[in-house]
């Protein structure tokens, strides 16, 4: 994303873009790296950056010999809204998932397990049976995780990788 595009992206995010997802790719090695790039390099106002709900970080993971690399999602962080100038110093980022290199898996953090996600609670507040019931919400997250894992296993077993594409995932949800 370039400066003019970044400003347009954040304007769409701030106004809600008719309640649709507004997403962009911004290169940064961490949530703070994304913030720094958006605010300092692309000149998006700090108040506009607060329209960001989450930052997903993908990075290559290398083999010990350095000859092989695999791209992995290594961090999923929520952006809180209560900070004023520096989201890192003011605890404006909350990690919900972190990559475990030993297991080659993305794992939930204690914050996610304990229900410290304003985004997920906001979504849950509009679902009967989930509003105010973090255990039900988290159980559903775990169930969906098992379903996605099974889809991957079936896709590998049958070599039908269309099962992993958005069209099928939309239907399977």
What are the residue ranges of the model-derived segments?
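Conserved P-loop NTPase nucleotide-binding/switch module
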Residues: 1-60
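A hydrophobic alpha-helix/topogenic segment detector
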Residues: 36, 46-48, 64, 167-169, ...
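Conserved P-loop NTPase
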Residues: 54-147
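Terminal-proximal interaction/regulatory segments of ATP-powered molecular machines
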Residues: 128-173
């Amino acid at each position: 994303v370039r400066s003019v595009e970044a400003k347009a992206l954040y304007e769409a995010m701030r106004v809600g873009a008719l309640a649709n997802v507004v997403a962009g790719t911004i290169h940064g090695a961490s949530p703070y790296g994304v913030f720094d790039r958006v605010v300092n390099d692309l000149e998006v106002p700090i108040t506009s950056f607060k329209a960001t709900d989450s930052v997903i970080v993908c990075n290559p993971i290398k083999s010990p010999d350095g000859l092989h690399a695999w791209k992995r999602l290594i961090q999923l962080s929520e952006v809180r809204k209560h900070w004023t100038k520096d989201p890192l110093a003011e605890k404006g980022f909350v990690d919900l998932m972190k990559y475990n290199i030993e297991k080659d898996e993305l794992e939930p953090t204690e914050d996610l397990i304990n229900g410290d996600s304003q985004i997920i609670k906001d979504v849950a507040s509009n679902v009967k049976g989930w509003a105010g019931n973090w255990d039900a919400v988290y159980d559903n997250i775990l169930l969906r995780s098992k379903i996605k894992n099974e889809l991957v296993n079936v896709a590998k077993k049958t070599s039908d990788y269309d099962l992993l594409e958005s069209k099928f995932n939309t239907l399977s949800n």
